[in-house]
Curated annotation (Swiss-Prot):
PANTHER family: DNA-DIRECTED RNA POLYMERASE I SUBUNIT 2
Biological processes annotated in GO: DNA-templated transcription
Keywords noted in UniProt: DNA-directed RNA polymerase, Nucleotidyltransferase, Transcription, Transferase
Naturally occurring in which organism (per UniProt): Mycobacterium marinum (strain ATCC BAA-535 / M)
CDD domains, sorted: RNA_pol_B_RPB2
Catalytic reactions of this protein: RNA(n) + a ribonucleoside 5'-triphosphate = RNA(n+1) + diphosphate
Compositional bias of kind Polar residues: 13-30
GO CC terms in record: DNA-directed RNA polymerase complex
InterPro entries in the record: DNA-dir_RNA_pol_bsu_ext_1_sf, DNA-dir_RNA_pol_bsu_external_1, DNA-dir_RNA_pol_su2, DNA-dir_RNAP_su2_dom, DNA-dir_RNAP_su2_hyb_sf, RNA_pol_bsu_bac, RNA_pol_bsu_CS, RNA_pol_bsu_protrusion
Official protein name in the record: DNA-directed RNA polymerase subunit beta
Length: 1176
């Protein structure tokens, strides 16, 4: 039952997301894109890859989709194995304890999803598909095989936008940055002897750690599974090595020979027993149990797993099995021996080692923060690990059932219990730190959330333990993780964002693309390199000048070597070149124009604050962009993109119908005024007309925060940078009233209110218009069912849904029994539990959803009916709201002036916003000034005089930039945008207005006049257009006042905080202020009757009602609590009056209180409540 469409269909195919990719900064490769004039000088040989690929590719690997198999085949992987298949292969076969029966699984496959995305959101369902596997039971005694297709539960599926819908809410699984399994060599200095000590850890994906070290006495030791240290030769002997073999392999090393001499164990048996005693102290050791223990610890796949990536890292570091495919994922004897040899050579200062296969490997320590040693666990792997946990729990159940059930009657279905698997998946999506409520403030915040990299979470770091090193920017982050975008608080450096061009390889390492350079010639051949591969090469930056043939213009080129060293080298030595100047930054950072002129701290704030911008009623793309706006908007998935080329057949506010060239008809439905996760308004509107031709990949409808398919987070406002009467001191902002009147910065916010009718012990609750003791005026907007009508204006306290709950009934009097007999159930006692608009909220009802058990809707147990009401609120900009630019320049509105009082230009145009000059120099975000200048140039248009040839400053500009019309939109890509000289020249070449005046001089300043007096200001002022965003920190959400409200149960003091409708805390320092002024009575009142003197509160109310004098305050409740606490410590505390008589804290006060309260009609049984509705 849908009344007022809330959530419209939103369908978009995968192809539409990945077709038509724009070039670096012009939007030419996306059909129908707005023509943004670009100041870019460099050609980018590679288009920006799909920005959601990190999510979608990983999930496709997990489910083993056809598209993933095709791309794996292209990479040369002959037998690709999906994530689910991998888990089933690991698990199979499950054998019983005697080995006579086995159960194996294969061929995971999915049915159709149960309901489309919009229905799942609407009905609080999970967007999931049923998973089936083939289970095969083999009786080894008889050779009998039973095969069945088994249902393994509903598996949450990823939407085309890279999200999951769990119980109706959209969630994102964040990729996790973890230390890769492998061998890590470390170097420390001993505090007492200043000697260099070396150690190595063999870290598996799953299993016991193995650690070797050389101590200050020059002995080589080993720790198995974090237990006590032993000589390393004990482990070698336990592995079956004789003294002669150790001599033969390690004869070159004095420290190994010294360790062998100190080792007292005679042979393999004794060494095994010695290890067993250390690992299992207190248990009687036997040779067999010791042998089994060691084998299980490191050499059995069930207990120890290096994972493919760990095997790859170990082989690479130690030079083992070079060029051979990865097969085993356990440790081998050779791994252990090669690790010890590497450690010994490292300690002895050698720089290279020849591995057993003849491969020479460098001997060096490892940097744990290097991106060659940190990898990403993407969505697919995180879910796979959770399924593995569920499957191993199921394995135990299967084993037990094999032994208890009758062999003849056993089928795969009777053995399998899918509950542990389903529970494990549910637990991950519902409660994991990495499964997060999607940030839907605007399209950019959603896109950034999907590209987020987190070092926190299970198996990762914790905020408390993470030091500075792991948080810091590392040279290996270049092109992989953005050095700018990270949170400002305790998570700084632990949460990052994937760089624009980065991708994740099958091992989970982040790769970034480079152009191959051959003999000093830069080719368009693209190679993706991981961080440790990049270390072996010399890389030039993207803006190194090259000629038309791709040769470096200068003989010596600035390059980057290992560990971030920068130097000039001959061009013949260069191996690779960056593909783009914006390669190192993330999407949000790449949307900051003139980023190269901003301090990194402010750029960080700018990138983060773009994600907090609220969608405005009318979106406006920036005059000064970076060329990233279009791709970001398309890949965020909030715009509607045409799947196929064709002609628009029909357009309305709700849908667009396209007749494709192949004769098929496709209808795209618009989302109309839907509520996002963050209460902002997600609305789509068509930007095409009937009869218009569209191409595949063209944007046909705008979403929130987009204009013509480009990201549009704010507004272009005319800004003057000057102090004004001190009203814009300390980042305060002065606004023109025009922005309020014309709804320039107005946003729509939608709140969802929900109520359900349940079965209670006293009877069923009822949603009804028949509410006791409520006037007809209050019920005026309710329909006959008791639900508010769509379009009704509501404010706090208004009833949205009428509901009554049965009261506990007492013994009926004869009169009541008579009434009950005449009127039936109508007269029974009910109380009003209606859904009311919370305190401080108001708006217009825009939609209602009713779910009822009678209509066969799925509802939780005990719930008969559920009603949701959506209330939209139009919020104009007001004092106290927070505004920000894209350069970390943020401020709170301090004053809104009438337009006629604002400073104005010589032609009478008043400015929209005044920012203080002090906000620029010490913050070093000069980008905002350059943006202001270029904004003015773009708004005015320009024409460069080329009568005497192109001026020197315009020499690098493309021909189409020599002139532009007013209101042109421009892009200045990061690190490749407009230069300072070009800006100065363009300011001098701006077109005059209709009166023939050029209002802003070549220095970017204008003569401004005071709007109040008409007098000119004594100095010229910087004036231009800046892109300003309205952030989610709105004063309406923060302002709060309390009259009467809830009290804490124990202390009887008012609760705190807006959510609890709490009071303002009058703290210790405020009390001092009162004391300083001698305001004794005011202070006494604050500490007693206004706080927790329960008797006094009621008596004061009584006195006010009766017009009497306010009585003396009583004893605060918290004082009584203090006495009780002291008495609980066995301290007998008495309260004495000034004359030494004991004061009796009477319990009878409560009775007086109840009596007075009853006379006044006050309900004192109110307890601590989380919701304001319960206060009435």
């Amino acid at each position: 039952m849908l009344e007022g469409r809330i959530l419209a269909d939103f369908r978009q195919t995968d192809a539409s997301l990945h077709q038509g990719r724009p070039q670096s900064s012009s939007n030419s490769s996306v059909p129908g894109a707005p023509n943004r004039v670009s100041f870019a000088k460099l050609r980018e040989p590679l288009e920006v890859p799909g920005l959601l690929d990190v999510q979608t590719d990983s999930f496709e690997w997990l489910i083993g989709s056809q598209r993933w198999r095709e791309s794996a085949a292209q990479r040369g992987d002959a037998t690709p194995v999906g994530g689910l298949e991998e888990v089933l292969y690991e698990l199979s076969p499950i054998e019983d304890f005697s080995g006579s029966m086995s159960l194996s699984f294969s061929d995971p496959r999915f049915d159709e999803v149960k309901a489309p995305v919009d229905e799942c959101k609407d009905k609080d369902m999970t967007y999931a598909a049923p998973l089936f596997v083939t289970a095969e039971f083999i009786n080894n005694n008889t050779g009998e095989i039973k095969s069945q297709t088994v249902f393994m539960g509903d598996f949450p599926m990823m939407t085309e936008k890279g999200t999951f819908i769990i119980n109706g809410t959209e969630r994102v699984v964040v990729s996790q940055l973890v230390r890769s399994p492998g061998v890590y060599f470390d170097e420390t200095i001993d505090k007492s002897t200043d000697k260099l000590l070396h150690s190595v850890k063999v870290i598996p994906s799953r299993g016991a750690w193995l650690e070797f070290d050389v101590d200050k006495r020059d002995t080589v030791g080993v720790r198995i599974d974090r237990k006590r240290r032993q000589p390393v030769t004990v482990l070698l002997k336990a592995l079956g090595w004789s003294n002669e073999q150790i001599h033969e392999r390690f004869g070159f090393s004095e420290i190994m020979m010294g360790t062998l001499e100190k080792d007292n164990t005679a042979g393999t048996d004794e060494a095994l027993l010695d290890i067993y005693r250390k690992l299992r102290p207190g248990e009687p050791p036997t040779k067999e149990s010791a042998q089994t223990l060691l084998e299980n610890l490191f050499f059995k796949e069930k207990r120890y797993d290096l994972a493919r990536v760990g095997r790859y890292k170990v082989n690479k570091k130690l030079g083992l099995n070079a060029g051979q495919p990865i097969t085993s994922s356990t440790l081998t004897e050779e791994d252990v021996v090669a690790t010890i040899e590497y450690l010994v050579r490292l300690h002895e200062g050698q720089t290279a080692m020849t591995a057993p296969g003849g491969v020479e490997v460098p001997v060096e320590t490892d940097d744990i923060d290097h991106f060659g040693n940190r990898r990403l666990r993407t969505v697919g792997e995180l879910i796979q690990n959770q399924i593995r946990v569920g499957m191993s729990r199921m394995e135990r159940v299967v084993r037990e059932r094999m032994t208890t059930q009758d062999v003849e009657a056993i089928t795969p279905q009777t053995l399998i219990n899918i509950r542990p698997v389903v529970a494990a998946i549910k637990e991950f999506f519902g409660t994991s730190q990495l499964s997060q409520f999607m940030d839907q403030n605007n399209p950019l915040s959603g896109l950034t959330h999907k590209r987020r990299l987190s070092a926190l979470g299970p198996g990762g770091l914790s905020r408390e333990r993470a030091g500075l090193e792991v948080r810091d920017v590392h040279p290996s982050h270049y092109g992989r993780m953005c050095p700018i975008e990270t949170p400002e608080g305790p998570n700084i450096g632990l949460i990052g964002s994937l760089s624009v061009y980065a991708r994740v390889n099958p091992f989970g390492f982040i790769e970034t693309p480079y152009r191959k350079v051959v003999d000093g010639v830069v080719s368009d051949e693209i190679h993706y390199l991981t961080a440790d591969e990049e270390d072996r090469h010399v890389v030039a930056q993207a803006n190194s000048p090259i000629d038309a043939q791709g040769r470096f213009v200068e003989p010596r080129v600035l390059v980057r070597r290992k560990a971030g060293e920068v130097e000039y080298v001959p061009s013949s030595e260069v191996d690779y070149m960056d593909v783009s100047p914006r390669q190192m930054v993330s999407v949000a950072t790449a949307m900051i124009p003139f980023l190269e002129h901003d301090d990194a701290n402010r750029a960080l704030m700018g990138a983060n604050m773009q994600r907090q911008a609220v969608p405005l009623v009318r979106s406006e793309a920036p005059l000064v962009g970076t060329g990233m706006e279009l791709r970001a908007a398309i890949d965020a998935g909030d715009v509607v993109v045409a799947d196929k080329a064709g002609v628009i057949e029909e357009v309305s506010a709700d849908y667009i119908t396209v007749m494709a060239d192949d004769g098929t008809r496709h209808t795209y439905r618009m989302r109309k005024f839907a509520r996002s996760n963050h209460g902002t308004c997600a609305n789509q509107s068509p930007i095409v007309d009937a009869g218009e031709r569209v191409e595949a990949g063209q944007v046909i409808a705008d979403g929130p925060c987009t204009q013509n398919g480009e990201m549009a987070l704010g507004k272009n406002l005319l800004v003057a940078i000057m102090p004004w009467e001190g009203h814009n001191y300390e980042d305060a902002i002065i606004l023109s009233n025009r922005l309020v009147e014309e709804d320039v910065l107005t946003s729509i916010h939608i709140e969802e209110h929900e109520i359900d009718a349940r079965d209670t012990k006293l009877g069923a609750e009822e949603i009804t218009r028949d509410i006791p003791n409520v006037s007809d005026e209050v019920l005026a907007d309710l329909d006959e069912r008791g639900i508010v009508r769509i379009g009704a204006e509501v404010r706090d306290g208004d009833i949205l849904v009428g509901k009554v709950t049965p009261k506990g009934e007492t013994e009926l009097t004869p009169e009541e029994r008579l009434l009950r007999a005449i009127f039936g159930e109508k007269a029974r006692e009910v109380r009003d539990t209606s859904l009311k608009v919370p305190h401080g909220e108001s708006g217009k009802v825009i939609g209602i959803r009713v779910f009822s058990r009678e209509d066969d809707d799925e509802l939780p147990a005990g719930v008969n009916e559920l009603v949701r009401v959506y209330v939209a609120q139009k919020r104009k900009i007001s004092d106290g709201d927070k505004l920000a630019g894209r350069h970390g320049n943020k401020g709170v509105i301090g004053k809104i002036l009438p337009a006629e009082d604002m400073p104005f230009l010589p032609d009478g145009t008043p400015v929209d916003i005044i920012l203080n000059t002090h906000g620029v120099p010490r913050r070093m975000n000069i980008g905002q000034i350059l943006e202001t200048h270029l904004g003015w140039v773009a708004k005015s248009g320009w024409n460069i005089d080329v009568a005497n040839g192109v001026p020197e400053w315009a020499g690098k500009l493309p021909e189409n930039l020599l002139s532009a019309q007013p209101d042109s939109i421009v892009s200045t890509p990061v690190f490749d945008g407009a230069q300072e000289a070009e800006l100065q020249g363009l300011l001098s070449a701006t077109l005059p207005n209709r009166d023939g005046e050029v209002l802003v001089d070549g220095d970017g300043k204008a003569k401004l006049f005071d709007g109040r007096s008409g007098e000119p200001f004594p100095y010229p002022v910087t004036v231009g257009y800046m892109y300003i965003m309205k952030l989610h920190h709105l004063v309406d959400d923060k302002i709060h006042a309390r009259s009467t409200g809830p009290y804490s149960m124990i202390t009887q003091q008012p609760l705190g905080g807006k959510a609890q409708f709490g009071g303002q805390r009058f703290g210790e320092m405020e009390c001092w202020a009162m004391q300083a002024y001698g305001a004794a009575y005011t202070l006494q009142e604050l500490l007693t009757i206004k706080s927790d003197d329960t008797v006094g509160r009621v008596k004061v109310y009584e006195a006010i009602v009766k017009g009497e004098n306010i009585p003396e305050p009583g004893i605060p409740e918290s004082f009584k609590v203090l006495l009780k606490e002291l008495q609980s410590l066995c301290l007998n505390v008495e309260v004495l009056s000034s004359d030494g008589a004991a004061i009796e804290l009477r319990e009878g006060e409560d009775e007086d209180l109840e009596r007075a309260a009853a006379n006044l009609g006050i309900n004192l049984s109110r307890n601590e409540s989380a919701s304001v509705e319960d206060l009435a």
